[in-house]
Structure formats: structure tokens, C-alpha cells
Amino acid sequence: ITDKLYQTLPLYNNLKTTGIYIYGSNYDIAGKKVTVNAESQVRNEDSKSRSFRFFAKILDADGKEVGHFDGERYTLKPGETKTVKVSGLLNNAHFWSWGYGYLYTVKTLLKADDGSKIDDVVTKTGFRKTQFGEGKFYLNDRAIMMHGYAQRTSNEWPGVGMSVPAWLSDYSNRLMVESGGNLVRWMHVCPWKQDIESCDRVGLIQAMPAGDAERDVEGRRWEQRLELMKEAIIYNRNNPSIIFYESGNKGVSREHMLQMKAIRDEFDPHGGRASGSREMLNINEAEYGGEMLYINKSKKHPMWSMEYHRDEGLRKYWDEQSYPYHKEGDGPLYRGKPAFEYNHNMDTFAASMVE
């Protein structure tokens, strides 16, 4: 329960509010410095005007305060909503990176003129510098080649499905990092918050889709995808592991690419994230691209091979010696034909990765 003067939630679809937005600027990687910017949408639902000051505290991974930024004094009329801002320099910064999921805690506070707390919100986030261009992607001033996994967004485990605790999400996503992957391309729909936060912790870059229909679409179906992307960006824009916004599983038109970029520019203009899709080599406005089954290169677009080892096996089958003792290839028909590619075991998948 909050005061009638409060910081909003990042729930745009239901509440039409955008919440907190925290981002870095003026990165000095070698000098370990970054300017931390905190923006908060504040609403006054009181029957009278309310005044407050806006503050931000930065805590490191050990809970030690490493930054305290004092903002301006604001006055909001009854029913008014306003975005307030504060920024300051963070020294001796730890930059989030592949395999190094360093996270800070940012506390944004509203205080009355007498110094009493009106409202505070705690946000976990990290800071990293990104650059896209000349066919390359740079993370913290170093070029990095993308390689990893295209994982079903369900990210399920045998026996429990999607209902997994956070530690199991960390274990699962850390396996991707420890096997040499620096990227997870979630398939078709936006992942749940637990997996997003898990990737923050283990240092795994994410490509985040909103919604997808296996191809570009028109009319109301495209409008729904835009709405999903807007909602997903607002809800997840403080998670440093998200670096790519995917407009669709396959390429989209130039007009649609521009619409997706407009959403990113409005709601995440400073997050250092690229908006693109697969098969976008011919769309100059796309900020990254890739191919399904082969390697391609571009003078402009950072690209990666997005499904070079396609495997549709169900994760619920380990091997023939483990419960449920599934025989390799057994299972229902798909469109009247055997579906071996779906009904095989994970030991077969592991062997194919080595091959």
C-alpha cells in the first residue's frame, strides 16, 4: 500500500504507467566510471497539491552504498503525473558482462520537505556499454561474436515443466554460459521475469522477442505485436542482459521495422539495445540481423547464425535408461508422419552438438 503520492508500476497495458527507468551514460570503461541516470514516473492521486524531493541511492553487490544522488524539488497538482529525474557519477564501477552478472541495487525515493519518506522503490540493474555497427557488436568496448542457444521461452524441465524455482533457472541458464554460450535467443514470445532476472545474474545476453507468428503479419495481428513489444520493453528495460529486441522470428518489412524502432526510441532511448530481426540484411534501418541455417556477413548489421543446429527434441526425455524410459523416436505422428525430430532424447541432442 502506497501513499497517494507514489512512483508508478511498469504495467503499461493495464495501468498505462511506465514506472522506473535506470540507465548508464558517459561510460568510461578503462576508468571504471559511468553516469547513472534514474527516471521515475510519479503520480499524485491526492485531493491537494503535493511537494517532494527525488533521491537515488546506489548499493553495490555487497549492499554497500556507493552513490547518493539528490534531485530537485517537485510539486504535482491533484491527478497530475510527471516523470522526475536524477543522475550522478558512479566511480569504481563494475560493468555487467558475459559471465559476469554484476548487479547494483538502485533505490529511488520520494521525500517530503521535512525529510520523511513518502515512497521508495528498489530496482536491481547493471551497467554495460554497447555499440552496434560495421557488422560487429561491442560490449564494454570489446567486439564479441554471438554464439549460444535458441531456447523455447518455456525453458521447462522434466517432471516440473515451467514451474521451476529461481535457483533452477540460474542452474539452467548458467549451463549455457559454462558451455561457451554468450547469448540466448528466446523463441517466439517474451520470457517470464524469472528467466530474465536469472540471465542478469549469470551474465547471459538475451534477445527478447515480444510476440511472433513465424512470419510478418498485417492488421490487428501486427498491432498486437506492437502492443506486446511496448509492454515488454517497459517491463524489462532495467534488465542489463537484454541487448537485442527481436521484431519477429522471421524478417519484417521496412515499415514494420521503423514502427518497432519507434517504440524502442520512445520507451528505451538510452538502454543501449538494438532493434532488428532475422533476415534483415536488405533493411538498412534494422540494427542487427541473422540467418537461420547458414553464416552471413554485413558491412553494417551485426549478424549471427540464429538456428545453425536445429533441434526440436522435447526436454522431458533424458535417455532410454531414465524415467519415463522413453525409446528414442517413439511418439505420436505429426500430420500423419513420424515426428522423430520432436520425439527424441536429450542424450541424442548432446551427441549431435559434439558432432
Segments predicted by a language model, with ranges:
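Substrate-binding/catalytic cleft of secreted carbohydrate-active enzymes
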Residues: 170-178, 182-355
